[in-house]
C-alpha cells in the first residue's frame, strides 16, 4: 500500500498488515463514521447489519480516504 500525508506530502510504502497496526485508530474512526452514515440511510433497514464491516473493508481505499479524519490517505493499494 502507498499512503501519502496530506500536509507534508511524505509517502509510505507499507504492507497491508503493517497498515492495519499503524493506522488502527484511524481505521476505527473511519469505520465508525461509515457506520453512522450507513445506518442513517433510509434504505439501510432493508440490508443485513452484519455486512457493514465487510462492505467497509471491501471499499477500504475509498472509505478510509472519505470517512477518515487522518492526515494520511491511501494513494494506491
Question: Positions of the model-derived regions?
Answer:
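A short, exposed loop/beta-hairpin motif centered on an aromatic-Gly-Thr core
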Residues: 10-14
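Acidic, low-complexity, intrinsically disordered interaction modules
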Residues: 16-77
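A short beta-strand micro-motif
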Residues: 1-6
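Glycine-centered tight beta-turn/hairpin loop motif at sheet-sheet or coil-to-beta transitions
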Residues: 7-9, 51
